[in-house]
Amino acid sequence: MAHSHTSSHLPEDNNARRLLYAFGVTAGFMLVEVIGGFLSGSLALLADAGHMLTDTAALLFALLAVQFSRRPPTIRHTFGWLRLTTLAAFVNAIALVVITILIVWEAIERFRTPRPVEGGMMMAIAVAGLLANILSFWLLHHGSEEKNLNVRAAALHVLGDLLGSVGAIIAALIIIWTGWTPADPILSILVSLLVLRSAWRLLKDSVNELLEGAPVSLDIAELKRRMCREIPEVRNVHHVHVWMVGEKPVMTLHVQVIPPHDHDALLDQIQHYLMDHYQIEHATIQMEYQPCHGPDCHLNEGVSGHSHHHH
């Protein structure tokens, strides 16, 4: 069995710095919105603070991923500590679902018994929240040519949260102009649905990763077909297992090949193929000269299992 590795590049310091600044801005204004929501009586502000919590958590996980990716693996933790960010994402997703349910429940109560809402204060805080989101987005997007995945994902989170702040501003304007307070719980429910969408996606992705599911973006049947088609010596690919450790995909696979003139060169070619086409830096490849026999040979097999090249 042959083990192939390539050294992964550590995240740049300015990625971590940008994440840290954006985290500070977002977390700070989230607290302002929570306090403002209670003082003004606005549920829409509290819902937007819940939405900001999704951003704060996304930024925190991105920061943790940067930190943990720098910590070397140990004898006990051979993959390092990257899975901790997945566990944190799972806990965060559940917390967000609970927060959303509580806000929707409170919104329904407010339809039955409306409460006064301080429109002016609500407006001021919602505008400040919008500016904070714009600042966070600029911090993350500015100089993103390094294309760090964590930073790009966090920027998308913040962009989504702009909608929450806009919603709170609309509710505040309606209350200031018309005094119609039901605008507040209506907008808070709409913002809660945005939070629930983010939370559901986070929950689904983190559960898939914790259960060692293959990355959603990777089509294993297509990978097997392409390897058989594009590497002439490869006749069959089977026993493919792919899972994620943090952001890094890890793969093991068996490859039936025509006996090569240079075993190591072919191994190197397969390794580089996986890295160039699928960004898989860590693959354990078992090369075989005989067809696979046994009940597990057709595991995760599409049509690819029967692709052969005749030479």
Swiss-Prot record:
Stretches assigned to the Periplasmic side: 40-45, 109-119, 179
Bilayer-crossing regions: 19-39, 46-66, 88-108, 120-140, 158-178, 180-200
One Gene Ontology cellular component: plasma membrane
Record carries keyword Metal-binding: no
Pfam family, one: Cation_efflux
Cytoplasmic topological segments: 1-18, 67-87, 141-157, 201-311
Record's keyword terms, sorted: Cell inner membrane, Cell membrane, Ion transport, Membrane, Transmembrane, Transmembrane helix, Transport, Zinc, Zinc transport
Gene Ontology MF: a single term: zinc ion transmembrane transporter activity
Disulfide-bonded cysteines: none
Species for this entry: Escherichia coli O157:H7
Gene3D superfamilies named among the record's database cross-references: Cation efflux protein transmembrane domain (1.20.1510.10), Cation efflux protein, cytoplasmic domain (3.30.70.1350)
Protein's name in the database: Zinc transporter ZitB
Cellular location(s): Cell inner membrane
Membrane topology: Multi-pass membrane protein
Main location: membrane
Family affiliation: Belongs to the cation diffusion facilitator (CDF) transporter (TC 2.A.4) family. SLC30A subfamily.
Function statement: Involved in zinc efflux across the cytoplasmic membrane, thus reducing zinc accumulation in the cytoplasm and rendering bacteria more resistant to zinc. It may contribute to zinc homeostasis at low concentrations of zinc.
